[in-house]
């Protein structure tokens, strides 16, 4: 099954190279960016009839952000002490503990991060007794 081309058009685009286009377009094919550029006088070119189009007029379009140090899912939102697995205190040194065992994948922090533009995160434990 052939996937349709996806076009995000009309939004203010921040590029990885530092260029900013007040009105631009992004063409995505098979999940990868194929082309992007500024829009001049409307659409970037005649769009394919079967293309999926997202009108981003008035919106900011930018690459996903990377959170390089966080405790998302380990220090859970709205859980208080019960949801805080950041620092384990059962022993003075706990090399046998892994942060992946403490992560709650349905923690609201992940949704909040996505809404803020974070698409990748390096999640680690606390440093109190590692």
Model regions and ranges:
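Conserved beta-strand segments that form the floor/walls of ligand-binding pockets within enzyme
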Residues: 7-8, 27, 67, 92
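Metal-associated gating/positioning segment near the N- to mid-region
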Residues: 59-127
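Short, positively charged
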Residues: 1-11, 87-90
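Hydrophobic/aromatic beta-strand patches that form the interior of the parallel beta-sheet core
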Residues: 8, 52-54, 66, 122
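Histidine-rich, glycine-flanked metal-binding segment
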Residues: 2-5, 13-62
């Amino acid at each position: 099954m052939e996937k349709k081309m996806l076009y995000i058009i009309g939004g203010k685009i921040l590029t990885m190279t530092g260029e900013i286009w007040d009105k631009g377009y992004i063409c995505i094919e098979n999940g990868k960016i194929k082309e992007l550029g500024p829009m001049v006088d409307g659409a970037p070119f005649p769009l394919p009839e079967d293309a999926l189009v997202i009108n981003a007029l008035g919106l900011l379009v930018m690459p996903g952000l990377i959170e390089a140090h966080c405790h998302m899912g380990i220090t859970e939102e709205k859980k208080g002490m019960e949801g805080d697995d950041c620092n384990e205190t059962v022993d003075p040194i706990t090399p046998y503990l892994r942060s992946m065992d403490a992560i709650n994948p349905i923690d609201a922090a992940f949704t909040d991060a996505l809404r803020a533009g974070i698409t990748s995160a390096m999640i680690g434990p606390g440093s109190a007794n590692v």
